């Protein structure tokens, strides 16, 4: 009999705005909070953890192995290894897939997998080992260079969204309508307390004392088509992608605890879901936002599912243009996609988002008694990743 790999707990921090509540918290502090809470929710002692795997993209100046820093700070003994993975925006979901594989192969028994990112703390830098003999020099923004800049074509991720909009014929109005729907769904979900179960509050030390952050900071209330249609294009003056129909620049952390179903039963834990399949795929870097199309198809094929079998989908909204293209190409029921809004409203802490979308999916599946779900993200450099889970 097959011993499934299951997710026994899942949680995330609130998503912080750029230079907002978490402006001075390094990524490993956000990761620490998520890891510790995930273990507490699972009822698992840190000493039982075989390894910790954390997605993170912006590691410049963050110290050796931020995943290890988060792991030890969360109370996991030094005997349990920890390491980081960088598959850009897919990192947090790839970390979960790697944990799944480690348990499946018998290399680990219990894995904490997740993602952590502080875009606010990404430093500016310059290579000065040879010195600057004369003249000025420019500081490089590592957040853009390492996280948001296409290395193959030499332009911003926003330009890839413009490419997708043209190729898939997604108009400015369609993008703005999608963005408004995302914001409005998130506003309604927050008023209904939909995210409270999945969020673990973060305590931030300030000069005036401790401040507890327990709510997503980025969503905007009362967004209308009229209010965002006035914005100018951000990447091409003749383009359609704006700050309002793109995801945010954000900080956050998320984590899940993985083990075999037999181990969960032994511990008396009811899993949130079992991992049925996962897949990643490559596309032209110039249209990286379409990566979820082949990745989702591959994950569904591995699972033996059809798109019609899906009860819920969480698809990361890097840009409205790519989200619309993914929906259009896959032809799935959009009423089941991002039912509480997505990254355009909630934000996109790049290395953590893969786990964030999975966590949000798992809790909404629980609320709706949904059976089959899929989480997917596009990935800079021309890739996509997807995972199928079942309750």
Where are these regions (language model features)?
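Condensing-enzyme catalytic core mediating Claisen C-C bond formation in acyl metabolism
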Residues: 1-25, 224-290, 294, 359-360, ...
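N-terminal extracellular/periplasmic Venus flytrap/periplasmic-binding protein-like
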Residues: 11-13, 24-28, 32, 41, ...
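Conserved beta-ketoacyl condensing-enzyme motif
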Residues: 23-111, 116-134, 199-214, 286-287, ...
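Short, well-ordered amphipathic alpha-helical segments that serve as non-catalytic structural scaffolds
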Residues: 28-43, 66-70, 95-98, 157-164, ...
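Conserved catalytic cysteine-centered active-site region
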Residues: 56-110, 140, 152-156, 222-248, ...
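Active-site-proximal alpha-helical scaffold in enzymes
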Residues: 87-117, 159, 165-194, 256-262, ...
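Flexible glycine-/small-residue-enriched beta->alpha junction loops
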Residues: 110-164
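Active-site pocket-lining segment
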Residues: 160-162, 195-198, 205-206, 276-345
């Amino acid at each position: 009999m097959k011993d499934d790999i299951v997710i026994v707990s899942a949680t995330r921090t609130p998503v912080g705005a750029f230079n907002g509540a978490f402006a001075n918290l390094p990524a490993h502090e956000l990761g620490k909070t998520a890891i510790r809470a995930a273990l507490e929710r699972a009822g698992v002692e840190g000493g039982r953890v075989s390894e910790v795997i954390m997605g993170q993209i912006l590691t410049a100046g963050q110290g050796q192995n931020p995943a290890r820093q988060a792991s030890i700070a969360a109370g996991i003994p030094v005997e349990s290894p920890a390491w980081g993975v960088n598959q850009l925006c897919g990192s947090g979901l790839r970390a979960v897939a790697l944990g799944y594989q480690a348990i499946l192969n018998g290399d680990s028994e219990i894995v904490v997998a997740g993602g952590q990112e502080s875009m606010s703390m990404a430093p500016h830098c310059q290579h000065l080992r040879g010195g600057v003999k004369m003249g000025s020099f420019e500081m490089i923004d590592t957040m853009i260079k390492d996280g948001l800049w296409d290395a193959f074509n030499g332009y911003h991720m926003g330009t890839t969204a413009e490419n997708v909009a043209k190729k898939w014929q997604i108009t400015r109005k369609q993008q703005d309508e999608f963005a408004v729907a995302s914001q409005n769904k998130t506003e309604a979900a927050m008023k209904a307390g939909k995210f409270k179960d999945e969020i673990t509050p973060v305590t931030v030390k300030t000069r005036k004392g401790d401040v507890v952050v327990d709510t997503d900071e980025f969503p905007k209330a009362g967004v209308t088509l009229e209010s965002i249609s006035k914005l100018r294009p951000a990447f091409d003056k003749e383009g359609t992608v704006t700050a309002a129909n793109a995801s945010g620049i954000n900080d956050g952390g998320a984590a899940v605890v993985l083990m075999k179903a037999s181990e969960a039963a032994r511990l008396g834990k009811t899993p949130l879901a079992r991992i049925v399949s996962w897949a990643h795929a490559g596309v032209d870097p110039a249209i990286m936002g379409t990566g979820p199309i082949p990745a989702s198809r591959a994950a569904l094929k591995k699972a033996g599912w059809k798109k019609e079998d899906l009860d819920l989908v969480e698809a990361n909204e890097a840009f409205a243009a790519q989200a619309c293209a993914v929906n259009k190409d896959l032809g799935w029921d959009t009423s089941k996609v991002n039912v509480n809004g997505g990254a355009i409203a909630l934000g996109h802490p790049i290395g953590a988002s893969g786990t964030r979308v999975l966590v949000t999916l798992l809790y909404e599946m629980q609320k709706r008694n949904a059976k089959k779900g899929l989480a997917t993200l596009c990935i800079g450099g021309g890739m996509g990743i997807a995972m199928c889970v079942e309750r």
